């Protein structure tokens, strides 16, 4: 693709995303489906702005590559070892069971047995990009079903290697004398990558970080991700698997969070590009010609995979309320099918339009998943949020709560328990089904669902409540909820959790003055104890803590208009001098006073 064409394609991608994704979000169908629809619109079977789909699809796989690197950063080797049973047990069972059933059905549809095996394996794979994105949107990351879903996806990435090796064997084009030397060199190269990454990556990043230039650190991160992807691709292995391993090797390093911040913007854009490319690849001509066959294939594919996944989730011990989410989020075909079917086609395993039909079915199955998840969310909401009889008298009797608490993680639990202990009527909104079930067993009033939906807030009693306490893990969710409450429920007194100073500034700019930085108070308390351990009188240490809190809050408010690092550093130095002067005056005053109290009195 020429430079001018590439620039035009990039402009079209951005325009399509800017138009389609907000519309999809407004319709409630999710960003992923918005990207897919945008791809259909600008692709060769839509408005025809872009025709070179294969080249763009290959480039857009970098979105999956970046995503797997970030996932690897979140899993250290010990955690990965803990997941071995679900990876090689449930993951292997899902691929084998789904592939066997789907291959049998393809043989009934007049596919050659070799093509049916390849087709069954390809269709058994799920979309890593779509499933992980939807799991994050639905808050499944920390749930048991989300962890199991990730394990299945990881095994599918591992299964890419033998699946690709199987194609020439089925086609009868494999070399009579297997080249063990090449295989040995690939294994050796892979081992060198693991050992080199284990012992070299941290010293290299330590050297780069010492330069103090953030742009160089970002460039080094991109080099690592792209280098690992190209290295694995040259070995004929999965690019995503290579970057995942690189992420795992750095998961316990001190640079983990900085690496995530450097990669995150690229990951989001490239994932969007990937979904747009998948939408562009949808062959509407084949769809029109074989409409009934394709429609039946999509339904059968989704149903079979859901049944297999649901059965495995039940055998694994997943809660009944989470099984449907787990089965649905992995029910689609995946991006690996494009690679596997192209390889099989080059070996002449498919006849006529068979490959095109399978790819259309895979693409359409990916479009059904966001809609399926939305429908299951509504079903779960009716099931979990509807009237329920309890053996014991429920804690909350009044339908009109005084306070709505959003989120029941570690932060939200402390707040909710304090309010409950003081007989405050509360309603908790939570996206984790496990937490919902647990709270309902204790008789607490809890709603399952996404709190950024206006109707859910109304159902929870937002129109009658006095306050809302927002304890979301993600700052983006917090700000979205603040804006929603200010627009639809202006009477609510908003209290929010801030993860740090940046989030605190954003809340202040949005007009939220009542917030708590999650580590600030505990850090101050430990600092006070440190002063006492150094010999300072407990009363004096307490006053030092209060002065520091007051001055820090004043600085926080004053620095809102400051947008330059120079301005912030200058003001911070000034505040430190001011704090030292206050402490000096306090110490002189305390020396004149009698020891009136002790820490433990």
Curated annotation (Swiss-Prot):
Task: Name the PANTHER family on file.
Answer: K(+) EFFLUX ANTIPORTER 3, CHLOROPLASTIC
* Matching InterPro entries: Cation/H_exchanger_TM, K/H_exchanger, K_H_efflux_KefB, K_uptake_TrkA, Na+/solute_symporter_sf, NAD(P)-bd_dom_sf, RCK_N
Q: Which SUPFAM superfamilies match?
A: NAD(P)-binding Rossmann-fold domains (SSF51735)
UniProt KW Secreted keyword: no
Coiled-coil-forming residues are: none
Q: How is this protein organized at the quaternary level?
A: Interacts with the regulatory subunit KefG.
Q: Which family does it belong to?
A: Belongs to the monovalent cation:proton antiporter 2 (CPA2) transporter (TC 2.A.37) family. KefB subfamily.
| Membrane topology annotation | Multi-pass membrane protein
What subcellular compartments does it reside in? Cell inner membrane
HAMAP family registered for this protein in UniProt: K_H_efflux_KefB
Annotated GO biological processes are: proton transmembrane transport
Give Gene Ontology CC terms. Answer: plasma membrane
Molecular function in Gene Ontology? glutathione-regulated potassium exporter activity
Show where the RCK N-terminal domain sits: 400-519
Q: Which regions span the lipid bilayer?
A: 4-24, 29-49, 55-75, 87-107, 111-131, 152-172, 177-197, 222-242, 262-282, 284-304, 324-344, 356-376
Q: Which UniProt keywords apply?
A: Antiport, Cell inner membrane, Cell membrane, Ion transport, Membrane, Potassium, Potassium transport, Transmembrane, Transmembrane helix, Transport
Matches recorded under Pfam families: Na_H_Exchanger (PF00999), TrkA_N (PF02254)
What name does UniProt use for this protein?
Answer: Glutathione-regulated potassium-efflux system protein KefB
Summarize the protein's role: Pore-forming subunit of a potassium efflux system that confers protection against electrophiles. Catalyzes K(+)/H(+) antiport.
């Amino acid at each position: 693709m020429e430079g001018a064409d590439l620039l035009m394609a990039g402009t079209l991608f951005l325009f399509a995303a800017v138009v389609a994704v907000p519309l999809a979000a407004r319709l409630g169908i999710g960003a992923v489906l918005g990207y897919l629809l945008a791809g259909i619109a600008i692709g060769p079977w839509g408005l025809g702005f872009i025709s070179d789909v294969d080249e763009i699809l290959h480039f857009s796989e970098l979105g999956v590559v970046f995503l797997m690197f970030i996932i690897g950063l979140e899993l250290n080797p010990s955690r990965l070892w803990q997941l071995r049973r679900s990876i090689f047990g449930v993951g292997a069972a899902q691929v084998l069971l789904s592939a066997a059933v789907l291959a049998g059905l393809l043989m009934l549809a007049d596919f050659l047995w070799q093509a049916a095996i390849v087709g069954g394996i390809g269709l058994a794979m799920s979309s890593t990009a779509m499933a992980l994105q939807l799991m994050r949107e639905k808050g499944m990351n920390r749930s048991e079903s989300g962890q199991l879903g990730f394990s299945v996806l990881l095994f599918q990435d591992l299964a890419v290697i033998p699946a690709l090796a199987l194609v020439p064997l089925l086609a009868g084009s494999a070399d009579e004398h297997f080249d063990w030397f090449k295989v040995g060199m690939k294994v050796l190269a892979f081992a060198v990558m693991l050992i080199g990454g284990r012992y070299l990556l941290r010293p290299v990043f330590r050297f780069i970080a010492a330069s103090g230039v953030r742009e160089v650190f970002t460039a080094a991160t991109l080099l690592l991700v792209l280098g690992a992807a190209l290295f694995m691709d040259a070995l004929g292995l999965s690019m995503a698997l290579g970057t995942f391993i690189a992420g795992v090797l750095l998961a316990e390093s001190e640079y983990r969070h900085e690496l995530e911040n450097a990669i995150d913007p690229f990951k989001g854009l490239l994932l969007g590009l990937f979904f747009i490319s998948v939408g562009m690849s949808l062959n509407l001509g084949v769809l029109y010609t074989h409409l009934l066959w394709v429609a039946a294939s999509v339904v059968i594919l989704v149903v079979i995979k859901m049944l297999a996944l649901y059965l495995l989730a039940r055998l694994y011990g997943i809660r009944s309320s989470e099984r449907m989410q787990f089965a649905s989020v992995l029910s689609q075909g995946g991006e690996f099918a494009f690679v596997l079917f192209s390889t099989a086609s080059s070996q002449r395993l498919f006849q006529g339009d068979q490959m095109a039909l399978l790819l259309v079915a895979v693409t359409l199955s990916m479009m059904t998943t966001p809609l399926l998840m939305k429908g299951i969310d509504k079903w779960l909401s009716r099931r979990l949020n509807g009237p329920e009889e309890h053996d014991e008298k429920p804690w909350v009797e009044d339908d009109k709560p005084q306070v709505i608490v959003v989120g029941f993680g570690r932060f939200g639990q402390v707040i909710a328990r304090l309010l409950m202990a003081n007989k405050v009527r509360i309603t908790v909104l939570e996206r984790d089904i496990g937490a919902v079930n647990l709270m309902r067993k204790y008789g607490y009033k809890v709603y399952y669902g996404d709190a950024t939906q206006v109707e859910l807030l109304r159902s929870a009693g937002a129109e009658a409540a006095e306050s809302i306490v927002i304890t979301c893990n993600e700052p983006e969710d917090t700000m979205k909820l603040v804006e929603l409450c200010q627009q639809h429920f202006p009477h609510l007194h908003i209290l929010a959790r801030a993860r740090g100073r940046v989030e605190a500034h954003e809340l202040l700019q949005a007009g939220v003055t009542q917030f708590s930085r999650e580590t600030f108070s505990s850090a101050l308390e430990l600092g006070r104890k440190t002063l006492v351990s150094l010999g300072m009188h407990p009363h004096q240490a307490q006053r030092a803590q209060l002065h520091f809190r007051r001055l820090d809050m004043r600085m926080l408010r004053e620095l809102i208009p400051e947008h330059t690092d120079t301005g912030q550093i200058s003001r911070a130095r000034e505040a430190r001098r001011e704090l030292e002067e206050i402490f000096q005056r306090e110490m002189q005053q305390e020396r004149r006073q009698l020891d009136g109290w002790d820490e433990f009195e």
